[in-house]
Swiss-Prot record:
Assembly and oligomerization: Forms a cylinder of 14 subunits composed of two heptameric rings stacked back-to-back. Interacts with the co-chaperonin GroES.
EC number of this enzyme: 5.6.1.7
Record's catalysed reaction(s): ATP + H2O + a folded polypeptide = ADP + phosphate + an unfolded polypeptide
UniProt GO MF annotations: ATP binding; ATP-dependent protein folding chaperone; isomerase activity; unfolded protein binding
UniProt keyword Chaperone, yes or no: yes
Record's function text: Together with its co-chaperonin GroES, plays an essential role in assisting protein folding. The GroEL-GroES system forms a nano-cage that allows encapsulation of the non-native substrate proteins and provides a physical environment optimized to promote and accelerate protein folding.
Protein name as annotated: Chaperonin GroEL
Pfam families: Cpn60_TCP1
GO biological processes: protein refolding
Keywords in alphabetical order: ATP-binding, Chaperone, Cytoplasm, Isomerase, Nucleotide-binding
Superkingdom: Bacteria
PROSITE patterns linked: CHAPERONINS_CPN60
């Protein structure tokens, strides 16, 4: 086992504090509308330019092991805030830095660290309650657009696109962010259910100009098996031909003789057919087939429940207003499934989301809900260069997380104002002893730090602006973009309650642990390898230097 280096008391805390400040100082330059960028060097390719706090934090590793421990703990604050609300990482870092700095001053002055922590925790619990009271629901498109704009660093186009996307696919819909091909940001909305499986044969194409298959009011046959024998399909094909409607077959696979016969029938115009593979694999495929069945009002033909393909009739098939199939995707528009059945299925999947343990499963289940309930919107980010594209994409993703958080828990006045107001409400809060009261004061003073940092980044004097904001009331605050005072809600400067709450809770949690640190242990740096010349026996080798 490697030898350890151990530091106690003030020695340990000073080193840790230095690490905290290095990381926090790098992150906090990005806060607010006039925050600057940070350039991150990459081992290959162009450097990354970002204004995203957590991206900066993740890049920082310090040489000194003790300082690095401090930096890593603050990194944890940013990561946790990012995981919980998807935004507010810089605010969380600024709060943590302030609590740690003020808290360690109090420890150095002889206060009891455990009581300080209890005081900080008490103040944060009270602050979260007050934040919830200040919170107003965020339901209309205008408020959603404002939240998106603020989170995307005052980029109004992004805010409006996110609001439009939420309007189109609903609050529960899936909105994904992709790299676009042009200079402009675009929004693509896919209504209906779309899955990533295209036609099994190009001979099914009936719209050569778009290279797609379009079926109007088709019957939809869903089979949880491979179909290779045409005899299994004949009864279905005859019934559909009599009904005079097209047919879409969604099965595990359609191959060999069965596929060839379908192609021949289509080309001769006997019956309009298209076949696609079922989406997903294994159990997920079964579940997605069932989703399509619920959406279209059909039944999945599965041998597991004793159903045979030969005996399937028109009553077992789903129907939709229209189906569009391209090389890679199939979109089912306006399925004829019953509303009650669809909402029941959505509720069932939501329950599975709550029980899911992995993020991947949760994401896939969320996609299924969206496909059943709303639709899917794709935000395509436009930029002139790849470096700008990466930076902008990260900002758009942040803005999207922020708007989701706003819809979930509402919004409060932005620009650091909500925390200043909350701190003012808690001036009468008291702990069980004087040390706890100091802890409460530490937390309340830290709540001003985001506002101070926003003002500082805008090149103004933090104390002057903070006092002016404190003298006001309600949503009165300072707009760093235009350098004027007024109602933050009217300015359209809103922060999601969830983002502000998460930032405060995680900052206080980690900062409290750092204040109560008394000892730090790390591996000793490995010394240089011992010089072979010092071994005695090989000393005579020194004379070989002349042979070079």
């Amino acid at each position: 086992m490697a030898a350890k280096d151990v530091k106690f008391g003030n020695d340990a805390r000073v080193k840790m504090l230095r690490g905290v400040n290095v990381l926090a100082d790098a992150v906090k330059v990005t806060l607010g509308p006039k925050g600057r960028n940070v350039v991150l060097d990459k081992s290959f390719g162009a450097p990354t330019i970002t204004k995203d706090g957590v991206s900066v934090a993740r890049e920082i590793e310090l040489e000194d092991k003790f300082e690095n421990m401090g930096a890593q703990m603050v990194k944890e604050v940013a990561s946790k805030a990012n995981d919980a609300a998807g935004d507010g990482t810089t605010t969380a870092t600024v709060l943590a830095q302030s609590i740690v700095n003020e808290g360690l001053k109090a420890v150095a002055a002889g206060m009891n660290p455990m009581d300080l922590k209890r005081g900080i925790d008490k103040a944060v619990i009270a602050a979260v309650e007050e934040l919830k009271k200040l919170s107003v629901p965020c339901s209309d498109s205008k408020a959603i657009a404002q939240v998106g704009t603020i989170s995307a660093n005052s980029d109004e186009t992004v805010g409006e696109l996110i609001a439009l996307a939420m309007e189109k696919v609903g609050k529960e819909g899936v909105i994904t962010v992709e790299e676009g091909t042009g200079l402009q940001d675009e929004l693509d909305v896919v209504e209906g259910m779309q899955f990533d499986r295209g036609y099994l044969s190009p001979y099914f194409i009936n719209k050569p100009e778009t290279g797609a298959v379009e079926l109007e009011s088709p019957f939809i046959l869903l089979a949880d098996k491979k179909i290779s024998n045409i005899r299994e399909l004949l009864p279905v094909l005859e019934a559909v031909a009599k009904a005079g409607k097209p047919l879409l077959i969604v099965a595990e696979d359609v191959e060999g003789e069965a596929l060839a016969t379908l192609v021949v029938n289509t080309m001769r115009g006997i019956v309009k057919v298209a076949a696609v593979k079922a989406p997903g694999f294994g159990d997920r495929r079964k579940a997605m087939l069932q989703d399509i069945a619920v959406l279209t009002g059909g039944t999945v033909i599965s041998e597991e429940i004793g159903m045979e393909l030969e005996k399937a009739g028109l009553e077992d098939m789903g129907q939709a207003k229209r189906v569009v199939i391209s090389k890679d995707t199939t979109t089912i528009i306006d399925g004829t499934g019953e509303e009650v059945a669809i909402s029941g299925r959505v509720t069932q999947i939501r329950q599975q989301i709550e029980d899911a343990t992995s993020d991947y499963d949760r994401e896939k289940l969320q996609e299924r809900v969206a496909k059943l309930a709303g639709g899917v919107a794709v935000l395509k980010v436009g930029a002139a260069t790849e470096v700008e594209m990466k930076e902008k994409k990260a900002r758009v993703e942040d803005a999207l997380h922020a708007t989701r958080a706003a819809v979930e828990e509402g919004v409060v006045a932005g620009g650091g104002v909500a925390l200043v107001r909350v701190a003012a409400m808690l001036t009468e809060l008291r702990g069980q002893n004087e040390d706890q009261n100091v802890g409460i004061k530490v937390a309340l003073r830290a709540m001003e730090s985001p506002l101070r940092q926003i003002v500082s980044n805008a090149g103004e004097e933090p104390s002057v602006v903070t006092n002016a904001v404190k003298a006001g009331e309600g949503n009165y605050g300072y707009n760093a973009q235009t350098e004027e005072y007024g109602n933050m809600i009217d300015f359209g400067i809103l922060d999601p309650t969830k983002v502000t709450r998460s930032a405060l809770q995680y900052a206080a949690s980690v900062a409290g642990l750092m204040i109560t640190t008394e000892c730090m242990v790390t591996d000793l740096p490995k010394g240089d390898a011992p010089d072979l010349g010092a071994g005695g026996g090989m000393g005579g080798m020194g004379g070989m230097g002349g042979m070079m």
